[in-house]
Amino acid sequence: MSSSPSLNTWSDALSGLSIGWFPLGLVIIAAIPLVFIALYALTYGVYGERKISAFMQDRLGPMEVGIWGLLQTLADILKLLQKEDIVPKLADKFLFVIGPGILFVGSFLAFAVLPFGPAFIGADLNVGLFYAVGIVAIEVVGILAAGWGSNNKWALYGAVRSVAQIVSYEIPASIALLCAAMLAGTLSMQQITMMQAGPGGFMHWFLFTNPIAWLPFLIYFISSLAETNRAPFDIPEAESELVAGYFTEYSGMKFAVIFLAEYGRMFMVSAIISIAFLGGWTSPLPNIGGLELNTMTSGPVWGAFWIIMKGFFFIFVQMWLRWTLPRLRVDQLMYLCWKVLTPFSLIAFVLTAIWVINH
């Protein structure tokens, strides 16, 4: 399915304005709404996790600040702003300061290629999927900088664990996403989404048009849990062993930035799996006879709604698993990656290639 001529990026739309600004400024302006939306959503992701954990443990959770505790996250931000920003005496101050910044930037750079609708995308790169996967390498640098710069053995152990885990699970995750790229015949995330659009709604999604797609779908979801250090793969932050992992020595807003970067990664991988296998911003509702549900629930605003809801669904599953599954051991973690997920991802790759050739 070819892309529609109306698929304009935000930067393209803004470049038509006769304001005489440098194009880079237009790109920055185009990114501002996306950044604010992401920050707002991720900030309340913290509130959502607190409420979900409270439900799992049969308690109320935040209730004091605002109605139903809705302003609790804002209160936490104000509290962190007032906390002392402590830098350990023997720490490498440059690495200690730049580590959280690299993590934050790395988490949000991938948002530039995530299509939030037919026209809501920062940059429709023809290698967008490759870019989104490769951007994880920047986060690895930030984690190492934070762990090494802290001059704390627990922080360093946590950083080494995290880097080994991310690099290892990046292999099955990348191969799983290549299966979706083969089905679509492109690495453009916008084009992958368009290939799954149609009046049949969810029946056009790769997960329902190709029985083999369930295998790379599950492989990527499991790998994404490891890449974001979420339970049961939260070994780099094991409280009973490493205090808090690579951010043990951080306080104040530096701690808040690292925390926010983690939720940014959670939404990023959730959006990627939604785009690769579940139609991204396309509506799940099909047209049934004269009832054109798909047509009525499609368009720019609906597109943003659908991909955000799909992303939030997978974030909910990640939070749910945190309070359901126990933490794996290091040997179990690596065994799962190298002897289970990687071989099965290669099998999925071969089966997908055979499917594409024969269809």
From Swiss-Prot:
Signal sequence annotation: none
Q: Which PROSITE patterns does the UniProt entry name for this protein?
A: COMPLEX1_ND1_1 (PS00667), COMPLEX1_ND1_2 (PS00668)
Domain of life from the UniProt record: Bacteria
Q: Name one Pfam family in it.
A: NADHdh
Does the keyword field hold Glycosyltransferase?
no
GO-annotated molecular function: NADH dehydrogenase activity; oxidoreductase activity, acting on NAD(P)H, quinone or similar compound as acceptor; quinone binding
Q: Known EC number(s)?
A: 7.1.1.-
Q: What is catalysed by this protein? A: a quinone + NADH + 5 H(+)(in) = a quinol + NAD(+) + 4 H(+)(out)
An example Gene Ontology CC term for this record: plasma membrane
The way it spans or sits in the membrane comes to: Multi-pass membrane protein
What does this protein do, in the record's words?
NDH-1 shuttles electrons from NADH, via FMN and iron-sulfur (Fe-S) centers, to quinones in the respiratory chain. The immediate electron acceptor for the enzyme in this species is believed to be ubiquinone. Couples the redox reaction to proton translocation (for every two electrons transferred, four hydrogen ions are translocated across the cytoplasmic membrane), and thus conserves the redox energy in a proton gradient. This subunit may bind ubiquinone.
Stated family: Belongs to the complex I subunit 1 family.
Subunit structure, per the record? NDH-1 is composed of 14 different subunits. Subunits NuoA, H, J, K, L, M, N constitute the membrane sector of the complex.
Instruction: Please report the name of this protein according to its UniProt entry.
Output: NADH-quinone oxidoreductase subunit H
